[in-house]
Design a protein with these regions (language model features):
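Long, well-ordered alpha-helical segments
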Residues: 191, 211-220
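Active-site cavity-forming subdomains of large catalytic enzyme subunits
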Residues: 1-209
């Protein structure tokens, strides 16, 4: 792209490629591949991302098999409640927002908005936060996607804040682990058969406690 002066058309065409790749792979000829994509609410492509699972529109801009989710900062919800504007940015112009959460994110985001108003950032778009939120909810009712997940809540409650920022969850939104270009998060699943922990006197809680402790250690 760089050598031919070409430009990327945003995240949607690449998500379409990932979607088709996942469908092309299956498990034992029965279970098709699965993938989930999370996008932060400040991203310039968020409005098109919301429509990925729609059954109408240009099918080249759709990913019917991909699970999608919104990764929402608290600041966006504040803007919704206060009926304020929300600014969408290209990640090229705000490279550190992805790695920030909480007060750090809010401070950086407000500074980028100031730069946009001053003309120092050219690629951006301003929308009403309530309109964008309404579209999120509408798409959720219409297609079941994208899911609603909260970036700041996940990071504030993480026991691994020292290890970096949580950028997403998994396909079932049951884990929240930090990731970076060198570190991926893995969802290991396990189950405990409660029948094996029941005696004539009822549930053997000590045995169950020992089993769960061992299982968690094995999954770690």
């Amino acid at each position: 792209i760089k050598g031919t002066n070409g430009k990327s058309q945003g995240v949607v065409p690449f998500l379409k490629v990932v979607n088709d790749t996942a469908v092309a792979v299956n498990q034992g000829g029965k279970r098709k591949g699965a993938v989930c994509s999370y996008l932060e609410t400040w991203h310039l492509d968020i409005e098109e991302f919301l429509e990925l699972r729609k059954n109408t529109g240009d099918d080249r801009r759709r990913a019917h098999d991909m699970n999608t989710a919104n990764w929402i900062p608290d600041l966006f919800m504040k803007r919704v409640f206060n009926d304020q504007e929300w600014t969408l940015f290209s990640p090229n112009n705000v490279p550190d927002l992805h790695e920030k959460h909480g007060k750090e994110f809010e401070s950086a985001y407000l500074e980028y908005e100031r730069l946009a108003i001053a003309g120092e950032i050219e690629v951006y778009k301003t929308v009403k936060a309530s309109d964008l939120w309404r579209k999120m909810i509408s798409m959720l009712f219409e297609t079941g996607h994208p899911w609603i997940t909260f970036k700041d809540s996940c990071n504030v409650r993480s026991p691994q804040q020292h290890a970096g920022t949580i950028h997403s969850s998994n396909l079932c939104t049951e884990i929240t682990l930090n990731t970076n270009p060198e570190e991926i998060a893995v969802c290991n699943l396990g189950s405990v058969n409660l029948v094996n922990h029941i005696s004539e006197s009822g549930l053997d809680q000590e045995k169950l406690k020992k089993t769960i402790t061992t299982a968690i250690r094995m999954l770690d």
